[in-house]
Design a protein with these regions (language model features):
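Soluble catalytic regions of membrane-associated enzymes that act on cell-envelope
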Residues: 129-298, 321-322, 326-340
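Transmembrane-helix signature of polytopic, membrane-embedded enzymes
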Residues: 95-114
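Aromatic-anchored segments of alpha-helical transmembrane domains
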Residues: 19-24, 111-120
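Membrane-interface coil-to-helix junctions
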Residues: 23-66, 70-75
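Juxtamembrane "helix-exit" motif on the non-cytosolic side of transmembrane helices
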Residues: 26-36, 94-95, 117-125
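Long, non-transmembrane cytosolic or organellar matrix-exposed soluble domains/tails
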Residues: 257-437
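Transmembrane-helix motifs of polytopic, lipid-linked glycan transferases
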Residues: 81-99
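Start-transfer (signal-anchor) and selected internal transmembrane alpha helices
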Residues: 1-20
Length: 437
């Protein structure tokens, strides 16, 4: 008992460090990512001299030094725990130096660390805005490529923001199940796939740049990334954005611009190895074309300047026409036309693509074509093979609507009806009718 009494301060400090570590690594892991991508610490003398020329610059230097470690979850959490304990121990040391070190004061020395964590690490917007917290979480999950976690979160707690819907559909696309499973999740029209950057919050631009990049819309990905770069406060730089801008210019063959971003990144702790590797082969067309990631992106990128803002379906169609093996772009093209309720185009695209990409036509596409054919061509044979259960469910859905005269009949709001394309179609048509004067 006496030994425990003598050790209680050390045990309390250890428990505090563990608590900070766990908080950062789990509930606040996405927030660490948010901070990391808004700063860029460089290990070179020029950066040090530049930042330390003013008090504000020195503060930014220290904040960026801490934030760089957030790139790796456990390392960032460990640094936060060490800093929190260091501050607490410094305060206790000061109290001892001025001879105010009664044991009952020891727990109070943790208060400054707790307050600093709460007010400096957790932004006010994160504390106040539920939608901002959702956006921060989805952005981190996309960056970390945690597709199953995105889908689990979206299924159990349907997204309240468009950013959440983009990320959900992107996760389905990266798993190769977008056209099979998209209507198991919340959908909100074609904007749930890609959207005009001028209508986005800055945080959403990180994720939408990732989505455009993987599809092959390299120029759009670059525009979104550059928009983030311009919107960062206080002239901050972002390692994530600098890497994306280097990547887009590398894929497009703009080596002079790519080199500029890589030169900055090569003096960073966690982006440096990547930058030095690609600086060494920059300009070597054969090496880049043979690169597993960037060579593949070159084959599926749009050859002409894409205009995502004005005609998404045309851009996606062009991507597929230029590279018929670009399945992600084909998935997005079919999903976009389904969400836009353009069933004639869905049928045309499917007939053109099914031999190369869809020997087994995905579930949602079968549902949309089956219903379209039942309504528009009741006496003609189906243009593609339709599964028996899919056809029966679709026919039953449309029959109930015809009998009740209500597209949103409550009896249809149960599985399997509410997980089909036609449930989305009915809801979308209902919204269109409400919008009409």
């Amino acid at each position: 008992m006496k030994k425990l009494k003598a050790m209680w301060k050390g045990l309390l400090t250890m428990a505090f460090a563990i608590a900070v570590f766990i908080l950062c690594l789990f509930p606040y892991r996405a927030l660490m990512n948010y901070h990391e991508q808004r700063h860029l610490f460089r290990w070179d003398s020029y950066y040090f001299q530049e930042q330390c020329a003013s008090l504000d610059g020195l503060c930014e230097y220290l904040i960026s030094w801490i934030a760089q470690f957030f790139y790796i979850g456990w390392l960032g959490a460990a640094v936060m725990a060490l800093l929190a304990v260091a501050l607490q121990q410094a305060i206790w040391t000061i109290l001892k130096l001025i001879r105010i070190h009664r044991s009952w004061l020891y727990p109070l020395t943790f208060i400054p660390s707790i307050l600093l964590f709460y007010y400096a690490f957790i932004p006010q917007e994160y504390k106040d805005d539920r939608l901002f917290r959702e956006a921060v979480t989805y952005d981190y999950l996309v960056r970390a490529q945690k597709w199953n976690k995105i889908l689990g979160k979206s299924y159990n707690h349907p997204p309240e923001t468009m950013n959440g819907i983009w990320c959900t559909n992107f996760a389905l696309g990266m798993r190769g199940t977008l056209l099979d499973d998209m209507f198991f999740y919340k959908q909100d029209g074609p904007d749930g796939l890609l959207m005009d950057a001028t209508r986005m919050q800055p945080l959403a631009l990180y994720s939408i740049s990732d989505i455009a990049f993987e599809i092959g819309m390299i120029n759009s990905a670059e525009r979104f990334a550059f928009d983030v770069k311009q919107r960062l406060p206080n002239n901050h730089k972002s390692g994530r954005i600098y890497q994306r801008l280097a990547e887009t210019n590398l894929v497009n063959g703009h080596y002079k611009i790519a080199r500029k971003y890589m030169h900055v990144l090569q003096s960073t702790l966690f982006y440096g190895r990547w930058a030095r590797h690609y600086l060494a082969i920059l300009g070597d067309e054969q090496a880049i074309n043979n690169d597993a990631r960037y060579g593949a992106l070159r084959t599926r990128r749009q050859q002409s300047n894409d205009q995502l803002i004005y005609a998404q379906d045309q851009v996606l169609a062009q991507l597929v026409a230029e590279n018929p093996k670009n399945k992600l772009a084909a998935d997005y093209l079919l999903a976009y036309t389904m969400l836009r309720l353009d069933l004639e185009s869905v049928t045309e695209h499917t007939l053109r693509l099914k031999d190369n990409l869809y020997p087994n036509v995905p579930k949602s596409v079968q549902e949309s074509i089956a219903g379209y054919w039942i309504m528009k061509h009741p006496n003609d044979s189906l243009p593609i093979p339709i599964g028996k259960s899919i056809y029966q469910t679709t026919a039953s859905y449309l029959s109930i609507i015809n009998q009740s005269g209500n597209m949103l009949d409550p009896s249809l709001d149960v599985p399997p009806y509410n997980q089909s394309y036609w449930h989305y179609h009915a809801q979308a048509m209902g919204k269109l009718k409400q919008q009409r004067p």
